């Protein structure tokens, strides 16, 4: 994603041909969503504890996000579109919506251009938690196929952003979302299984309403993203013997074929302007490329990966948050005017990557790691203060529907309501 926003294709003599047939942004985010779908439900189920899962997520994401916002606001001049928090004229609405990380489905500008993917992550977390507390979490295949099928049939007819088409409607929607999210978290962090289930179903219900009725992106793209995430979960379950492999390949195959068909049917005739790529060919090749990369990584999962790659994985979240603000900060000093010779282009690329990786490492080392450690301490304190109650309620599968079951084995807007930003729903 860093190289995509850096504009690496513009520096290559054949970059235009690549752009016509392949979108690095869509490739990157779909690969990211596949990985997330594979990892996140496994993390929740290994813990077998909704509260522990959410404490870990909150301390994993929010400190780095807040620090990245603070650093970016200090670095960037007013008017720079990559960071818009406190710069929209509706600062309270913007802050509240971005605090929930649902802003991209609340008709509110993303506080940072790249954080639209965090909205999809948060919605996925809500859905996964709701399914888990009902004992429906192993129905990943059915859910993935359902999302893909709805995208196929209704991808060009369902309207997006239907709940908030004015500033007043947006304000009301944000207030409602904040209240629901706060109530949901209070319940999920209580340690009481019945309350945890109520909280999980509250936020999962909100997630479903937003993704079907108020997505900023075209509906076919939104639904395909969630089909992809749950397909990632299907692969995890097949790998660990929780579902039949034939069923898994059928489900995943349907999602992949649907993604290509969706691109051909809907991502053309001007619609590609809203998905930020050149058309259905680039859409389809990028989507299938993400799947091919993920499956190749799965085949190599038992191999020992080089340390530089594992290190890059560790700092990837910080790099994702910082790479655009850093680019906008250093480009006027190091690449103005833009380099024209091959040597100068190479030097500029190396300089940008080096600065970005150093900054990402510092954010990871100084913010991410300490707050993850603090999160573990906070969880222990919560468990001492509010011990988890016994699991209750009917359900299916090994969880019995409880909020703490036994663990299983092992990123067109209405005028005046939003401010345009650089990153679109397929650019990361």
Each model region followed by its residue ranges:
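Membrane-interface junctions at the ends of membrane-embedded or membrane-associated helices
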Residues: 43-52, 134-142, 191, 236-249, ...
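Interfacial loop-to-helix transition and helix-capping segments at the boundaries
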Residues: 16-29, 108-120, 159-180, 190-201, ...
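Membrane-proximal cytoplasmic C-terminal regulatory module of class A 7TM GPCRs
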Residues: 332, 337, 369-409, 413, ...
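Alpha-helical transmembrane segments of multi-pass integral membrane proteins
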Residues: 26, 221-237, 249-369
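Membrane-interface helix-loop-helix regions
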Residues: 15, 61-126, 139, 149-163, ...
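Aromatic-anchored segments of alpha-helical transmembrane domains
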Residues: 2-5, 147-162, 203-215, 253-268
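Transmembrane alpha-helical segments and their boundary/interface "anchor" motifs
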Residues: 26-30, 43-82, 89-97, 124-125, ...
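Functionally critical transmembrane alpha-helices in membrane proteins and complexes, commonly lining
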Residues: 1-44, 59-65, 69, 289-293, ...
């Amino acid at each position: 994603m860093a190289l995509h926003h850096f504009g690496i294709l513009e520096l290559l003599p054949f970059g235009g041909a690549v752009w016509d047939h392949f979108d690095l942004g869509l490739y990157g985010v779909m690969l990211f969503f596949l990985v997330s779908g594979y990892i996140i439900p496994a993390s929740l189920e290994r813990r077998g504890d909704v509260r522990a899962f959410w404490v870990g997520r909150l301390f994993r994401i929010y400190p780095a996000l807040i620090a990245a916002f603070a650093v970016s606001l200090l670095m960037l001049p007013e008017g720079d579109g990559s960071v818009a928090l406190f710069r929209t004229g509706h600062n309270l609405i913007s802050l509240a919506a971005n605090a929930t990380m649902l802003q991209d489905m609340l008709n509110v500008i993303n506080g940072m251009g790249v954080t639209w993917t965090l909205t999809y992550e948060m919605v996925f977390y809500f859905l996964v938690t709701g399914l888990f507390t009902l004992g429906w979490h192993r129905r990943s295949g059915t859910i993935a196929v359902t999302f893909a099928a709805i995208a196929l049939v209704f991808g060009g007819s369902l309207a997006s952003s239907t709940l908030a088409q004015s500033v007043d409607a947006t304000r009301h929607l944000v207030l409602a979302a904040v209240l629901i999210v706060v109530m949901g978290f209070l319940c999920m962090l209580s340690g009481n299984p019945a309350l945890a289930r109520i909280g999980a179903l509250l936020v999962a219900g909100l997630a479903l309403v937003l993704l079907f009725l108020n997505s900023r992106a075209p509906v076919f793209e939104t639904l395909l993203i969630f089909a992809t995430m749950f397909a990632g979960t299907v692969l995890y379950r097949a790998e660990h013997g929780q579902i039949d492999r034939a069923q898994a390949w059928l489900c995943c195959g349907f999602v992949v074929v649907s993604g290509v068909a969706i691109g051909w049917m809907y991502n053309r005739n001007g619609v590609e302007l809203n998905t930020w790529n050149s058309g259905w060919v680039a859409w389809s090749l990028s989507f299938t490329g993400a799947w091919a990369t993920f499956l190749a990584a799965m085949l190599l999962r038992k191999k020992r990966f080089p340390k530089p790659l594992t290190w890059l994985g560790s700092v990837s979240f910080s790099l994702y948050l910082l790479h655009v603000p850093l680019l906008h900060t250093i480009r006027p000093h190091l690449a103005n005017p833009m380099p024209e010779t091959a040597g100068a282009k190479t030097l500029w690329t190396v300089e940008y990557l080096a600065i970005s990786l150093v900054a990402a490492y510092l954010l990871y080392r100084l913010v991410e790691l300490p707050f993850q450690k603090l999160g573990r301490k906070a969880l222990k304190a919560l468990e001492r203060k509010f011990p988890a109650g016994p699991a209750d309620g009917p359900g299916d599968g090994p969880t019995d529907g409880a909020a703490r079951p036994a663990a299983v084995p092992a990123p067109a807007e209405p005028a005046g309501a939003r401010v345009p930003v650089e990153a679109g729903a397929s650019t990361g």
